[in-house]
């Protein structure tokens, strides 16, 4: 499976085309809209989320609520486009009209794609860069993730995400929660945190950053249960599932790090405390005493829960802008200001769920049969029986 997205932040719409989704998957707009709404929530979001009412339109690949096996096209309209029709229109405009708009951007923002992208593509108006590099694009990545989650659900895999840290405020580790319990708690938290004791402290940190014209980042974690043993590969570097998951996390806007299992903590412990001892019994088959590997060894699943974390830096658009240089005059200026969030970590957690879900669904479809859901389900059932008796 693969997908490609298109569209600009203030353009008419965002589009994603999904290829390779098996036939026979139950899929309706409500499944996708639920995920889009989750992305819009979270303490610290900016005014843009008050403007947009993200809903999906399914325009191909689905008939009467069931996927056909052909490419699926999903569209999300940008409600704010009505205020940007001239600025972001596709038709040519005169030089006078261009000057009258006064929205040309020549002062790149530190931390964004602005300067590097302008140099790469030769854009003298940095808006040509920021409109596409904007995290608004993650709207349709969440839509794609919603389709992947539906695949996982029908294949017996559950997934959930939560926030571990915001602006240096850390949640304590809470173990032995089911995926359903994690989902219930986080859906009722403004910061998608499991630890109610630090929830308000996280919100206070966000509010302080906002009032100071600043921004803060954090850490999110995604957990998936129900993956069969041996999904992925040790044979080639580009088929290792842990590599794909880390790459997916790093592809999210403003993410600067990824961990699987105990992650970087493994460097501080001896092997005897890191590696997960193997157990077997007639009821469960092969299992592990611990899950420090985060459900992945040698690029393949172990059958234990997948545990992936991502580190999000503070959003680089600041209302108290940093120093920059005008690309036309080369004079020192403060960077341009665009409407933005003070903290998007809770929303980014939803995006992280989506990209992890896509990689897991892709791996299952690739390994157990590509064409139709019924065949994939049968093959997974047979594989699980085989693995248990191996």
From Swiss-Prot:
InterPro entries reported for this sequence: Chorismate_synth, Chorismate_synth_AroC_sf, Chorismate_synthase_CS
Pathway info: Metabolic intermediate biosynthesis; chorismate biosynthesis; chorismate from D-erythrose 4-phosphate and phosphoenolpyruvate: step 7/7
The keyword NADP is assigned to this record: yes
Cofactor note: Reduced FMN (FMNH(2)).
Cofactor: FMNH2
GO molecular function annotations of the record: chorismate synthase activity; FMN binding
Source organism, top-level taxon: Bacteria
Keywords: Amino-acid biosynthesis, Aromatic amino acid biosynthesis, FAD, Flavoprotein, FMN, Lyase, NADP
Record-linked Gene3D superfamilies: Chorismate synthase AroC
Catalytic activity: 5-O-(1-carboxyvinyl)-3-phosphoshikimate = chorismate + phosphate
The EC number(s) this enzyme carries: 4.2.3.5
Residues noted as binding NADP(+) in the record, renumbered to the chain: 39, 45
GO CC, any one term: cytosol
GO BP field: amino acid biosynthetic process; aromatic amino acid family biosynthetic process; chorismate biosynthetic process
Positions bound to FMN: 132-134, 253-254, 298, 313-317, 339
Keyword Amino-acid biosynthesis: yes
Subunit structure: Homotetramer.
Protein family (similarity comment): Belongs to the chorismate synthase family.
Protein name per Swiss-Prot or TrEMBL: Chorismate synthase 2
Phylogenetic lineage: Bacteria, Bacillati, Bacillota, Bacilli, Bacillales
């Amino acid at each position: 499976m693969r997908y490609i997205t298109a569209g600009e932040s203030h353009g008419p719409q965002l589009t994603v085309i999904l290829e390779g989704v098996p036939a026979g998957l139950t899929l309706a707009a409500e499944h996708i809209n639920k995920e889009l709404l989750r992305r819009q929530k979270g303490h610290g979001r900016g005014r843009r989320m008050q403007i947009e009412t993200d809903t999906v339109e399914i325009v191909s690949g689905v008939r009467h609520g069931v996927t056909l096996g052909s490419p699926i096209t999903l569209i999300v309209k940008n409600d704010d486009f009505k205020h940007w029709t001239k600025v972001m229109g596709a038709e040519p405009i005169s030089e006078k009209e261009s000057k009258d708009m006064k929205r040309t951007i020549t002062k790149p923002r530190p931390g964004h794609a602005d300067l590097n992208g302008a140099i790469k593509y030769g854009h003298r108006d940095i808006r040509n860069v920021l409109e596409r590099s904007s995290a608004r694009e993650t709207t349709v990545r969440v839509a794609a993730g919603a389709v992947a989650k539906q695949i996982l659900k029908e294949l017996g895999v559950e997934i959930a995400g939560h926030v571990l840290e915001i602006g240096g405020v850390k949640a304590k580790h809470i173990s032995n929660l089911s995926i359903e319990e994690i989902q219930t708690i986080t859906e009722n938290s403004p910061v998608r945190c499991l630890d109610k004791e630090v929830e308000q402290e996280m919100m206070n940190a966000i509010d302080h950053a906002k009032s100071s014209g600043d921004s803060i980042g954090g850490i999110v974690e995604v957990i998936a249960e129900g993956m069969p043993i041996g999904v992925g590969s040790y044979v080639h570097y580009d088929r290792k599932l842990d590599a794909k998951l880390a790459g997916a996390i790093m592809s999210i806007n403003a993410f600067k790090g990824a961990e699987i299992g105990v992650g970087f903590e493994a460097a501080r412990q001896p092997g005897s405390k890191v590696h997960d001892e193997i157990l077997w019994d007639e009821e469960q088959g092969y299992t592990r005493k611990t899950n420090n590997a985060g459900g992945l060894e040698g690029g393949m699943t172990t059958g234990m829960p997948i545990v992936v974390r991502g580190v999000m830096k503070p959003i680089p658009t600041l209302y108290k802008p940093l120093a920059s240089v005008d690309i036309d005059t080369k004079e020192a200026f403060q960077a341009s200001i665009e409407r933005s969030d003070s903290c998007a970590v809770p929303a980014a957690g939803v995006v992280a769920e989506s990209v992890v879900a896509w990689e897991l669904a892709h791996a299952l479809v690739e390994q157990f049969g590509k064409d139709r859901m019924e065949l994939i389900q049968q093959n997974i059932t047979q594989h699980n029986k085989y693995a248990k008796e191996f």
